[in-house]
Amino acid sequence: LRKIDAIAVVASAILVAIVWRFADAPITAFAERIQSSNIQDTIRIANRFGGGMNPAMVIFFFLVAGVVYRHHRWIAYGVAMAFAGAAAGVSVQIVKYTAGRTRPELWLGPFHHARAAATSFPSGHTVGAFALAGVLMLASPSRTMRVIAFLLALSVAVSRVMAFRHWTSDVLASAAIGMILAAIAVRAVMTAEVSFRE
């Protein structure tokens, strides 16, 4: 782990702890106050980016487009996304059932833990979205692609809070987990000499 990586992990942990302690409940209360049918429609669209078959379709797109158009970088993106996505799926299930944090929709408060039915932390949608988007954010030379990837992943994270499926600290920590998995996948693919350059 490089020094900058360690600093980013520590800073993320401190931010998550502060939000968990002081901001989770007020942010969720604010989300409840601003609910509308338009916001609900937007939440449904954003949720689709992070769940179901959409992550697999993104990976498939990069692999196929890379092969068809002979863009080795896109193939490398697809391979790194596949590794990051698989790691996200496994790690989310392990942590989710170990942490036992209750979801905001149960209205038990941000400090309530009940292992049997509590699956708020981490947000699988957010970990997956940032794991895949993180590959592009870390490896793509295109600023436009990096910004679009970040905004799509961010929309997933915000939608999970607005849908009362996760606390804000859940999605912040989940975004950090996703980025860590993306960094590991990018380094693994680069080490295996799959080129991110044309």
Region spans (language model):
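N-terminal transmembrane-helix/juxtamembrane module of multi-pass inner/ER membrane proteins
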Residues: 1-61, 96-118
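Membrane-helix interface segments
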Residues: 38-39, 71-76, 105, 141-147
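Hydrophobic, aromatic-rich transmembrane alpha-helices
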Residues: 57-68, 129, 133-137
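Interfacial segments of alpha-helical transmembrane regions
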Residues: 5, 62-91
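Membrane-embedded catalytic cores of phosphoryl/pyrophosphoryl-handling enzymes
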Residues: 2-7, 108-198
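Alpha-helical membrane-inserting segments
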Residues: 19, 27, 91, 95, ...
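Hydrophobic alpha-helical transmembrane segments of integral membrane proteins
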Residues: 79-104, 166-179
